[in-house]
């Protein structure tokens, strides 16, 4: 543990540089999740010393309140193209505001710097948090196709480890903790953080800001209007409980809950990969795999968690050597031609994403759901950026194809709207008029 400065002072020193780092990621700096969402670039353009002073003072006075989260519906791999989207075949991800995202990032960095031993102990086996603890150097190609070495961590390392372990072990147990984040007790999470991290230090700033993060909820009006009823069901069910996925601190909460379980697995030298609450256990024997599955379930029940649902299809399964399965939203498949394992974006994700774009077949629907054509173009950009941010090109062999198909679908549906609904020959529209029609740019 290093000599501590107050968290409010740490925020004052590092907020602007963290904001600038976010802005340097040009592919995401203009991402918007609803019409009122303030993007990274918007926030940066309006940033001032007064903004920073107000943030720091609210942290110092223990009065910082998070903005509402933005609820986003993502289809699970079992959600097929024409399926009606429900809580069973989708997941809710909640995106914090730019300001709150920066504060949560700084909060985690502050813990790593000033409570490093405690932080590392909790996060050692969670790939969502152990960036500075476990890194991996892999061979890859640069943009010119030249072989280079690249250091990976986080979800990239977790997925790379999966393909590596898959080639070493015949069986894998894919464990799914039933509604893990939704079942986190907020009060217990805050008390555990206070006990494990703060102890006798009485760091009230950290406790107050952590509580603000944990108790933050999503706002229905910020969600996609097309899925308003589904989002409403989610938010009503989760009201006042759990920690929302999509927040940087969610993984810290999961690691605090699973700390004892991690140690039990590692202590027994069991091959194990965990990213937040999603984990895999490997074995070269089917009998051993069955015993490990029972071992996992027994020990999770000790902390009021389970990998078996009371009703419905069970998601925790044992997979054989060449069986395909999905992990962290990506298909892990065996390529018989290359005799190796690869990661791919599941086909149902293609179908569902393109289906959402193709559903706009009339200007009536555009006006009803988006208001006007300019906002419709913004809606498509938000939709595509949401998908491609998660299913990025560097994580899947078909990532580039996925992005290309979404962009093509977006162009085609707008072209069709012009041709079919306005009786205008798209090919005869000049480029300036296309810009005006698509984007409202003169």
Where are these regions (language model features)?
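Helical (often loop-to-helix) elements that flank the catalytic cores of nucleotide-handling enzymes
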Residues: 285-307, 335-336, 340-341
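Non-catalytic, polymerase-adjacent accessory regions of viral genome-replication enzymes
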Residues: 1-61, 432-442
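Conserved polymerase palm-domain catalytic core
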Residues: 163-276, 280-297, 384, 392-393
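Right-hand nucleic-acid polymerase module
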Residues: 97, 101, 105, 234, ...
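Active-site-proximal segment of RNA-dependent polymerases
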Residues: 104, 108-185
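Short, conserved non-catalytic motifs in the polymerase core
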Residues: 70-102, 119-151, 228-253
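Reverse-transcriptase-like RNA-dependent polymerase core
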Residues: 56-85, 208-231
């Amino acid at each position: 543990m290093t000599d501590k400065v107050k968290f409010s002072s740490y925020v004052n020193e590092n907020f602007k540089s963290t904001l600038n780092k976010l802005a340097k990621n040009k592919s995401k700096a203009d991402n918007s999740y609803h019409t009122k969402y303030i993007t990274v670039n918007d926030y940066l353009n309006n940033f001032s010393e007064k903004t920073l002073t107000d943030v720091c003072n609210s942290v110092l006075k223990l009065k910082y309140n998070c903005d509402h989260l933005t609820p986003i519906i993502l289809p699970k791999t079992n959600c097929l193209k024409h399926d009606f989207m429900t809580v069973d075949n989708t997941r809710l991800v909640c995106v914090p505001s730019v300001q709150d995202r920066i504060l949560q990032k700084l909060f985690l960095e502050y813990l790593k710097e000033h409570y490093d031993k405690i932080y590392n102990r909790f996060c050692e086996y969670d790939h969502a948090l152990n960036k500075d603890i476990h890194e991996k150097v892999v061979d890859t190609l640069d943009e010119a196709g030249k072989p280079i070495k690249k250091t990976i961590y986080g979800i990239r390392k977790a997925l790379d480890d999966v393909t590596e372990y898959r080639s070493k072990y015949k069986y894998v147990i894919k464990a799914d903790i039933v509604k893990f984040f939704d079942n986190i007790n907020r009060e217990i999470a805050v008390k555990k953080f206070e006990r494990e991290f703060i102890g006798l230090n009485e760091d009230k700033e950290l406790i107050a800001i952590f509580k603000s993060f944990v108790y933050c909820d999503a706002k229905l009006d910020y969600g996609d209007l097309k899925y308003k009823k589904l989002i409403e069901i989610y938010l009503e069910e989760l009201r006042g409980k759990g920690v929302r996925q999509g927040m940087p601190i969610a993984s810290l909460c999961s690691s605090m809950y699973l700390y004892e379980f991690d140690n039990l697995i590692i202590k027994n030298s069991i091959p194990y990969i965990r990213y937040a609450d999603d984990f895999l256990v490997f074995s070269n024997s089917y009998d051993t795999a069955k015993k490990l599955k029972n071992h996992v379930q027994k020990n999770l029940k000790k902390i009021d968690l389970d990998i078996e649902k009371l009703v419905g299809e069970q998601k925790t399964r044992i997979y054989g050597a060449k069986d395909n399965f999905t992990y962290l939203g990506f298909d892990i498949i065996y390529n018989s031609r290359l005799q190796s394992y690869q990661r791919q974006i599941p086909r149902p994700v293609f179908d569902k994403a393109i289906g959402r774009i193709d559903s706009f077949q009339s200007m009536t629907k555009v006006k009803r759901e988006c208001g006007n054509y300019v906002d419709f173009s913004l809606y498509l950009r938000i939709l595509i950026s949401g998908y491609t941010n998660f299913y990025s090109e560097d994580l899947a062999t078909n990532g580039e194809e996925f992005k290309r198909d979404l962009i093509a679908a977006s162009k085609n549906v707008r072209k069709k709207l012009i041709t079919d609904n306005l009786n205008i020959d798209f090919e005869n529209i000049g480029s300036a008029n296309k810009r005006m029609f698509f984007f409202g740019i003169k």
